[in-house]
């Protein structure tokens, strides 16, 4: 085949099919405080419905939502003692999945047992373990603590969530390697970008500068002040991101821990959750620190809504066409695949250590020229998707 024939070939998109299977691993359902109120809570996840409740002993439990008697929804019932009572016939289920009592019956049938989900409470967050093979969670896959949680020098979590429809949760995981989208979607300018995948973790190390043409987007005034981000996925759906800055006002850009997590609802929908805690600047009272955290969370919300706007309108693509300055998308997806196969089918290349650093030289030259041109012309990098993202973030926060 000649070069002309090759150049005339049209690249087609392979949209593939989202997996029907849900990822094995720990998934964060939200904050403990939001579930520990003595009421049942319904969570739609993993293609089914769950009920989360805390009994009189304060222990949080997660069961299948539908009663094994006649299918009543336990999330519509009530907590009685250390059981969840079905609203249909008052069958009462313990956190271990056994039916403890049927008030109108002489005895409880021996087979009266429902599915219970392994849970963990870490850094004020509630996790459930999902495994299609039914295995117990291995100790080496435990979710790590956020080191500053509970530290009086830091705020508590400011937490938000978005239901994303029409997309598989692989879309958000792809962002781990996507350096360029931080410039075009989030109005940052990455100066250093590196990935490390090993075992069940995937890490992104990024250093970036604010864009001087991002008028109305960035609050930065010192455009040489570097932002730093060390972000790691622990398993398929839970990321801890440490964010800090050099040469900035600690009140406007404090040290931050950001949680970026999600759980699948269906093969084409998921609930995206994100939380922030900030270090209280010296001399700043707790109330003001909470206001700072709220402001940071609002900025984070806009950033995630920018991503959602892209996902809502893009095609699924299993064969992305990449250039040299793109990140290791295929290697990341190979790492991600380990959570969708049986444990015995995990291949060494899915979990072996892999490192990749993007050469940012060409990108920075191009981006700086674009920024300089916009500044000289008095143009802003402000884009329509930012307006939509701000409106969505405002609606999510109820403001």
Curated annotation (Swiss-Prot):
Its cofactor is [2Fe-2S] cluster; Fe cation. The keyword Iron-sulfur applies. PROSITE patterns: RIESKE. Residues 26-128 form the Rieske domain. Pfam families: KshA_C, Rieske. It comes from the Bacteria. It is an enzyme of class 1 (oxidoreductase). Induction: By cholic acid. One of its GO terms (biological process) is cholesterol metabolic process. Binds 1 [2Fe-2S] cluster per subunit. Fe cation binds at residues 175, 181, 186, 307. Could catalyze the introduction of a 9alpha-hydroxyl moiety into the ring B of 3-ketosteroid substrates. Homotrimer. The two-component system 3-ketosteroid-9-alpha-monooxygenase is composed of an oxygenase component KshA and a reductase component KshB. This is Probable 3-ketosteroid-9-alpha-monooxygenase, oxygenase component. It comes from Rhodococcus rhodochrous. The gene is kshA.
């Amino acid at each position: 085949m000649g070069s002309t024939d090759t150049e005339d070939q049209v690249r087609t998109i392979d949209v593939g099919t989202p997996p029907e299977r849900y990822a094995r691993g720990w998934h964060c359902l939200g904050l403990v405080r939001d579930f520990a109120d003595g009421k049942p809570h319904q969570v739609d996840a993993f293609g089914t419905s769950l009920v989360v409740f805390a009994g009189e002993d304060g222990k949080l439990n997660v069961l299948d939502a539908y009663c094994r008697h006649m299918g009543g929804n336990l999330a519509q019932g009530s907590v009685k003692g250390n059981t969840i009572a079905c609203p249909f016939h008052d069958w009462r289920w313990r956190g271990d999945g056994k039916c403890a009592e049927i008030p109108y019956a002489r005895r409880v049938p021996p087979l009266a047992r429902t599915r219970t989900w392994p849970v963990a409470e870490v850094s004020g967050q509630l996790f459930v373990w999902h495994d299609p093979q039914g295995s117990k969670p291995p100790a080496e896959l435990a979710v790590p603590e956020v080191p500053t949680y509970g530290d009086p020098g830091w705020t508590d979590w400011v937490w938000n969530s978005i239901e994303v429809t029409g997309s598989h949760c692989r879309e958000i995981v792809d962002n781990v390697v996507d350096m360029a989208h931080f410039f075009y979607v989030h109005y940052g300018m990455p100066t250093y970008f590196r990935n490390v995948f090993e075992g069940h973790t995937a890490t992104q190390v990024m250093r970036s500068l604010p864009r001087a043409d991002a008028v109305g987007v960035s609050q930065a005034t010192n455009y040489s002040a570097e932002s730093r981000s060390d972000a790691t996925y622990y398993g398929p759906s839970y990321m801890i991101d440490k964010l800090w800055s050099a040469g900035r006002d600690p009140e406007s850009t404090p040290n931050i821990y950001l949680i970026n997590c999600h759980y699948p609802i269906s093969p084409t929908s998921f609930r995206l959750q994100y939380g922030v805690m900030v270090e209280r600047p010296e001399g700043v009272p707790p109330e003001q620190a909470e206001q700072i955290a709220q402001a940071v969370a609002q900025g984070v919300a806009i950033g995630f809504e920018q991503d959602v706007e892209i996902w809502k309108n893009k095609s699924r693509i299993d064969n992305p066409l990449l250039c040299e300055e793109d990140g290791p998308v295929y290697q990341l997806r190979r790492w991600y695949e380990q959570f969708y196969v049986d444990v015995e089918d995990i291949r060494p290349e899915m979990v072996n250590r892999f490192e990749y650093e993007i050469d940012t030289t060409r990108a920075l030259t191009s981006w700086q020229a674009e920024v300089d041109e916009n500044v000289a012309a008095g143009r802003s990098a402000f884009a329509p998707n930012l307006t939509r993202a701000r409106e969505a973030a405002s609606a999510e926060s109820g403001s």
